[in-house]
């Protein structure tokens, strides 16, 4: 199965609006038992999340996984920092890619692949307001063209 495919649990649509994605990479997430149950129930939010590399390890920060209903004392803090599973070569590549100005690691989507939770990280550069307007304008033009073609084909 190619990267980014599987049973999609959560998507970060705002990331594609706020950032231009340069490259993507797939990583596993270290979760506790109650957290994976919440992820399978699609109770995860990526909106404010980002990833960082500290001491040669990748970490997922500010991603909210809601506490599991029947988890009682085993529930973790919903906003806790979670370790990402990447190989050393991938981490060094990410460090080199992030050295550019304005580059960041943004979680694009979380999905289940062969029973494991995976996150698709995007190496992203922030968009300016005028870039966002251009994207919206281009999207509207494509929509208009499709509408015209559809009406001509009828």
UniProtKB/Swiss-Prot annotation:
Predominant place of localization: cytoplasm
GO molecular function terms noted in the UniProt entry: RNA binding
One Pfam family from the record: SmpB
InterPro entries cross-referenced by the UniProt entry: SmpB, SsrA-bd_prot, SsrA-bd_prot_CS
Localization, UniProt: Cytoplasm
One GO cellular component term noted in the UniProt record for this chain: cytosol
Disulfide-bond pairs as recorded: none
Record GO biological process: trans-translation
Family that this chain belongs to: Belongs to the SmpB family.
Annotated protein name in UniProt: SsrA-binding protein
Upper lineage: Bacteria, Bacillati, Bacillota, Bacilli, Lactobacillales
Gene: smpB
